[in-house]
Swiss-Prot record:
Keywords: ATP-binding, Glutamine amidotransferase, Ligase, Magnesium, Metal-binding, Nucleotide-binding, Pyrimidine biosynthesis. It comes from Picrophilus torridus (strain ATCC 700027 / DSM 9790 / JCM 10055 / NBRC 100828 / KAW 2/3). The gene is pyrG. Homotetramer. One of its GO terms (molecular function) is ATP binding. CTP binds at S12, D145, I146, E147, K180, T181, K182, P183, T184, Q185, K216. This is CTP synthase. ATP binds at G13, L14, G15, K16, G17, T18, D70. Its EC number is 6.3.4.2. InterPro entries: Class_I_gatase-like (IPR029062), CTP_synthase (IPR004468), CTP_synthase_N (IPR017456), GATASE (IPR017926), GATase1_CTP_Synthase (IPR033828), P-loop_NTPase (IPR027417). Pathway: Pyrimidine metabolism; CTP biosynthesis via de novo pathway; CTP from UDP: step 2/2. The lineage of its organism: Archaea, Methanobacteriati, Thermoplasmatota, Thermoplasmata, Thermoplasmatales. CTPSs have evolved a hybrid strategy for distinguishing between UTP and CTP. The overlapping regions of the product feedback inhibitory and substrate sites recognize a common feature in both compounds, the triphosphate moiety. To differentiate isosteric substrate and product pyrimidine rings, an additional pocket far from the expected kinase/ligase catalytic site, specifically recognizes the cytosine and ribose portions of the product inhibitor.
Amino acid sequence: MHYIVITGGVISGLGKGTITSSLSYLLKNSGFKVTNIKIDPYINYDAGTMNPYQHGEVFVLDDGSEVDLDLGNYERFLDTDLTGNNNITTGKIYKSVIERERHGDYLGKTVQIIPHITNEIKERIKRASSGYDIALIEVGGTVGDIESMPFIEAVRQLRSTDDVIYSHVTLVPEINGEQKTKPTQHSVKELRSLGISPDILFCRSEKPLGKDVIEKISLFTDVPASGIISMYNVKNVYMIPEIMMRQGILEYIKKRTGTSNHNLDYTWSNFVENIKNPAESVDIAIVGKYIELQDAYISHKEAFSHVTGNTGISVNIHWVDADKLLNSTHDLKNVDGILVPGGFGYRGVEGKIIAARYARENRIPYLGICLGFQVSVIEISRSLLGLKGANSTEFDNNTDYPVIDILPEQSNVSDLGGTMRLGSKKVLIKDGTIAKNIYKSDIIYERHRHRYEVNPDYIERLEDSGVIFSGTDDEKIRMEILELSDRDNYIATQYHAEFKSRPLNPSKVHMHLVLKALEYRRNIYERNTSGISR
């Protein structure tokens, strides 16, 4: 078994997850069976209850696990489905150890960080990596953080039983035009003080590292120059595997592991070329409540990148604060499409309802996801059914028209963590609908994360107003997809299609939105050139 451990130094946010994902892609396409493991040192059991402002998007796996957004990167780059076992947190480790202690598994021993916590960490790593040739382990946080210490010690101990390559992500800042190596030197020194000497350094910088800088880093860190990889800024993360490949990272790893008989099958050439040189572009508004931290919507951003890579249509995202739409819809005036993503809590909901109405009334291509699906129902109920004050019981428990209501099985749930309708669920698609044309299938499986649904008492009235519920759950009780009978560019889904979008297999509904946005843009151009203003 081969392990590649990725740690980070100097500062957080250097892109360990993207580097890990890119290296995984190269190794997988060289013929290795590869998996990724993310270690998150926080005491939370999982990411499910974390504020997106602090932690970014909560990513949902097929098995319903709510995990760090880096696992979304892993799935996209590896084109695979991971499980909750691929995300190790301090909360999971301590919960397991304490439960075992209460059960008497330690036979009266004093339970300590070493060996009991570190052994639990190693057991979980081995469980998640079983059956693979190489497992890449990303240790969250920065070397030296007190929360990370047990995990650093655990991955250090791996070397006694398995082949381990230690890699370290550092920062090489540029000051007055000179690339500075001191932060990297000190970060490696800190890592060594914990018993780990890195074999590879991934050096983040604005521009490619100069040869003299690489030689200097090599001299002071004892990492060979061939193991120092310049990770400079690029336009799109899907260009990174090619940058690594050009610097010989695969040859270095193959030599280190003694597996030199694999040849790379680089499948992204056309995909990356379309991202670099798109033929056309569209402007799409994402109307959200967490737009100050765009990582809260990273899977939507990546889904649009996947569409670009497959079509050559670039997506210029306009980040629109939902609350600002309460005063003016000016930010929606010149866009070719509108996406209303998921979210929780009342703040921003009325702005999202305004966005849904603006798209419907102006026939602008629209995609609603999760809450974006629910606000479409609320908006149509208010505007077309005349149900003034129609709402979701999530936001107004006393509304006269609860067109969105809590799932029956959720009504007595008190805990927030891991209790929603989560994970991959079957969706049945009706014939003769836009959804059927998009998916070309009667059955799909998509990931969910919600507590509320369309109230069955209002379905018939909504359908009479022109709503088509073109997708349902397998019992045909829960509504999953909404479209309108008088157009083909308005669709909303209860599920999160963005979570299953992949570079070479983009989300079908994101693809549909972009294609309809381009059609809308071309129509506007034709009208303008004919003397009709937008």
